[in-house]
Amino acid sequence: AHVPHPPSHLCEKASAPSRAQKVRNIFMIFKKSGPPEWLLVCLGNYGKQYENTRHNIGFMAAERLIDKRDLRCNRLRFRALTEVIEFGGANVLLMMPQTYMNLSGEAVGEAARFYKIPADHVIVISDDISLPLGKLRVRGSGSAGGHNGLKNIIAHLGTDAFPRVKVGVGAPEHDIVDWVIGPFTANERKVIDGVLDRALGAAECIITDGVSAAQNRYNG
């Protein structure tokens, strides 16, 4: 079976971290001594041809978190690139499934069962064609809404009662498949780059304050 290699930019750490960063990294190592209590699942398709596509919003959010915190996320486990991190004061398994979008649930279900993590502690960041470009929507449960990645996660968790952070990519003017695997324009990417931190903030808020608080703060 083909085992994908992690993208090279995810395997490298920034040079010369500051003293404050070193202290924070030590704290994060201490926090990571226990098993993860949450999954943060960032959806996308692996491969360079998908890097700037609408379906890869989740991967973009993960990469933003990796870059901001000087992290690694290159351990291939549960058919996903993974790393246990401190996020929202909890031990969280960051996941970038490498199954392709439509089989994302295989990776998520396997990790959730292994760590005995309940569905309401599985947070998924994904694209949403029903939302205008750059608009966020936090939901605590619900149908897949035509998103095959979410549909597969629902099937493998056996429930739709898991929180998700949806990032709008706009409605297609043509075939949906071509739209979601199509690249952002330069102007669209600027909008998306501006919303990734908010998507991560919404996910963190779910952990610290609950879904309702995240909805009140980030939906709109």
What do these predicted ranges mean?
Residues 137-143, 181-185:
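Short glycine-enriched, charge-decorated loop/helix-capping segments at active-site entrances
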Residues 16-22:
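Short alpha-helix boundary/capping segments
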Residues 23-140, 150-155, 159-165, 172-175, ...:
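Nucleotide and nucleotide-moiety/phosphate-recognizing core
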Residues 176-180:
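Active-site-proximal loop->helix
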